[in-house]
Amino acid sequence: MSLYESVQNQIKESFVFISNEYSDDLLQRVLRPDRVMEFHIPVKMDDGTTKVFAAYRSQHNNAKGPYKGGLRFHQNVSKDEVMSLSAWMSLKTSVVGIPLGGGKGGIIVDPKLLSKGELERLSRGFAAKLTPFIGKEVDVPAPDVNTTGEIMAWMVDEYSKLVGVWTPGVITGKPLSIGGSQGREKATSLGGCFTIDEYFKNSGQSLAGKTIAIQGAGNVGLNFATLIVHNYGAKVVAISDSRGGIYNPDGLDVDQIEKLKSENKSVSEYSNASQISNDDLLLLNVDILVPSALEQVIHADNADKIQAKVILELANGPVTPQADKILTSKNIPVLPDVLANAGGVTVSYFEQVQNNTNYYRPESEVNEKLEAIMRPATLAAIQTAEKYNTTLRNGAYIVSLRRILEAMKVRG
């Protein structure tokens, strides 16, 4: 089964609960992207040769607003992947109630093999190819895997040159100096904190003292670790990166880990902890397991061994559909990616609004507005799951699908 087929199955499974409210015709439209584009970008390399790179942009659904979603530069980018991620983006923007749709794109490339000049020429070439199909009220890309604020700056500059007017709102995730938003760097992590805190609050519990294992010490995982410890009093007992992980049941010093990562060192160089593999970290007996790096890390072969009391999906698609069913049978709730990591796109939306109104907000105000969106969205997913006696994933999907389908229905 392809990744997109599994996304379609997830949507169909949730639609069953509201099939008496909306026609199957509307469902069929949501099951397919509005448009998927393939591009070929010629780039003059430093040695004088020209290399052609394949790229994609999937525009899934814009019933509620402009397509929105990242651009990734990775050797494994595929049409199936961007279609799947664009559908998740539609669900993500809808579940938090922001007026955007879903899109995703990428280039098949390993950016580590390019010089900075080659990377800039590739980025500008992609922007030129995308220009007829994007715009601040049409489709608004953003950073994703292996893309940075600097790359977004090159792309918004190229787009603006081609259309003849400076248009910062066409792309988000930009550097602050050209219209980026305060709070964007930590938005996904902070949104995840609000989500898991609201989950425990709903059952009369606090995060204080809760044990947490985090797979992934990149921007999202590391920021989540520091925020959840310092703001909520939780205890991070394990964390990993691509080179391995560390575990200390008494808790880890997240500030020391942050310092290690800032020096481009591995968390495995942390002294006061046992070494642990990425695979074994997932199986620890903790209160909260946070996959924040790779897709499909919890699958049919390891789901039955998961001991965490709840899973917070800060990565996209870290739990396979088969694993989902096993976790449900074990009564392990999963706060799904479309909700749990929606803080990033929410602050990207704030960036769009700030660009388009030319009024910029301080970080404290951005964070307050993010909290005001994430907490009610989490509560709505929990209450919907309880109403229909189903999983939190279905609860979030039902909330999201209902909003998309209603917008499509009233638009005709």
Q: Which residues fall in each region the model found?
A:
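Conserved active-site and cofactor/substrate-binding residues in soluble primary-metabolism enzymes
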Residues: 2, 6-9, 21, 77-80, ...
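Adenosine-phosphate binding glycine-rich loop
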Residues: 2, 199, 308-412
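Short, Gly/Pro- and small/polar-rich lid/capping loops
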Residues: 2-40
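Glycine-rich, N-terminal phosphate-binding loop and its surrounding beta-alpha-beta segment
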Residues: 38-111
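Glycine/serine-rich phosphate-binding loop and adjoining beta1-alpha1 elements at the start
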Residues: 93-208
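Glycine-rich phosphate/diphosphate-binding loop of Rossmann-like nucleotide-binding domains
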Residues: 174-175, 180-286
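Rossmann-like adenosine-cofactor binding region
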Residues: 244-334
